Amino acid sequence: MNVQLKKGILELIVLVAVREKDMYGYELVAEVSKVVDVNEGTIYPLLKRLTNEKYFETYLRESTEGPPRNYYHLTASGILYMEELRGEWTELQDGVNSFLKEHGYE
């Protein structure tokens, strides 16, 4: 997938994943990787930025498999931002699909 296209949709995918349940970083990388080829070096800076922008809150939870894990929780403003991105994504999809259909690509 084109890098710029991937970056554009990655925020929405991460926000939707964490809305379903709080996740720690590596768990989120594994979940997002099911639909987009990403690695930790892509996800962690995004998580930091979204946390700084108050879309996520973080908390530590003990782990039976090592040190405590830093979990991400979607805030109310994060939910609003996610819905805004979802609307933009739907609008973009509809526009692109309409354009392609008009030009013989169905």
Label each PLM-derived region with a short phrase.
Residues 1-3, 105-106:
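Short, Lys/Arg-enriched, disordered terminal segments
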Residues 2-44:
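N-terminal helix-turn-helix DNA-binding core of bacterial DNA-binding proteins
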